[in-house]
Amino acid sequence: MPRRREVPKRVILPDPKYNDKTVAKLINILMVGGKKSVAESILYRALDIVESKSGEEAVKALKKCLDNIKPALEVKSRRVGGSTYQVPVEVRPDRRVSLAMRWLIKYSAARSEKTMTEKMAGEILDAFNSRGAAVKKREDTHKMAEANRAFAHYRW
């Protein structure tokens, strides 16, 4: 824990197209090398594809997709008496969103479609329907936490 003052959270302005902070945050995480316009075009085109395929509003579909990816529990390493235990802990709300967005982008990039737009749209649709690699990552994280439930009393 830092002993100095707490650093204030930066205010993120909503994105211009959907006027939504979640979309703006996802664009910022998707951005590589400061190329925001590229990240915006990838995400906006992906959301257009999602809207046409799912029939649901793009932002609503994205938020439902992120809700399906957000982990409730995770494991953290804790060293006790010479051995390291994987201790299950609850995930803070802001970290849940952050992890969900990172996993969405990571597993989108790993897909086999041609362009990042198609990959992103495919992963959003899969997560929207509670399947896909990002949702599997969440399930695996929960399984790890459940398997190490015996060490829950080591929480700090």
Swiss-Prot record:
- Gene Ontology MF terms: rRNA binding; structural constituent of ribosome; tRNA binding
Keyword tRNA-binding carried by entry: yes
In terms of CDD domains, this protein maps to: uS7_Bacteria
InterPro entries associated with the record = Ribosomal_uS7 (IPR000235), Ribosomal_uS7_bac/org-type (IPR005717), Ribosomal_uS7_CS (IPR020606), Ribosomal_uS7_dom (IPR023798), Ribosomal_uS7_dom_sf (IPR036823)
One GO BP annotation of this record: translation
Keywords in alphabetical order = Ribonucleoprotein, Ribosomal protein, RNA-binding, rRNA-binding, tRNA-binding
Pfam families from the entry? Ribosomal_S7
The answer on whether this UniProt entry bears the keyword rRNA-binding reads yes
Naming one, the record's GO cellular component terms include: small ribosomal subunit
For this protein, the record's PANTHER family field holds: RIBOSOMAL PROTEIN S7 (PTHR11205)
Subunit arrangement?
Part of the 30S ribosomal subunit. Contacts proteins S9 and S11.
The entry's family comment says:
Belongs to the universal ribosomal protein uS7 family.
What is this protein's function per UniProt? One of the primary rRNA binding proteins, it binds directly to 16S rRNA where it nucleates assembly of the head domain of the 30S subunit. Is located at the subunit interface close to the decoding center, probably blocks exit of the E-site tRNA.
- Return the protein name: Small ribosomal subunit protein uS7
